[in-house]
Amino acid sequence: IYRLCDEYGLYMIDETNMESHGSWDTAHATGDYDYIVPNNKPEWLDMMLDRANSMYQWDKNHPSILIWSCGNESYGGKDIYEMSQFFRREDPTRLVHYEGVFHDRSYNDTSDMESQMYPTVEAIKEFLAKDRSKPFICCEYTHAMGNSCGAMHKYTDLTDTEPLYQGGFI
C-alpha cells in the first residue's frame, strides 16, 4: 500500500505499532494511573524508541508519508513524548501525531496537531472556539459502529467553514 500511495499521491500517517488502552481499564476503575503503560516508566523507553526507529528506518523513503504517529490509544506521558522527539530529530520535514495527549495534557507538545477520536462535529467546533493553537485532525472519525457512517457529510462540510479543521482518517 505504501508504494501505491507513493505512486498515486495519497498522503499517509505512518503509525508506530503501539497500543495499550487495555491498561487504562484498571487505572480508571481504581484511580491508580500507575497501571497505564508506557506512561512515564523508564523501563519502557528503550523499547519505545526501538519500535519508533524500526518503523522510521523501514519507511523513511516513502514520499507519501506526511506524518509520523507515535501510536494508538496509549495514553500519554514522557515515553511517548520522547518518541515524538526522536521523529523530530530524525526527520524535521514531517509532522508528528499522537492522539493520546487529549487524555493527558502534561506533554501536550508530543503532537503537532490536536487529534481526537470520534468527536462530534459540535465537539470539534467547541474545542476550536476555545483553543486555536494547533490544527485539528480526527485520527479516527467513522467506521461501521454507532451511526454506521451516517452524517459523514457534516465532517467534510466543516472543512469549508473552519480553516483549522484538517479533516480526518477512517
Where are these regions (language model features)?
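Substrate-binding/catalytic cleft of secreted carbohydrate-active enzymes
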Residues: 1-170
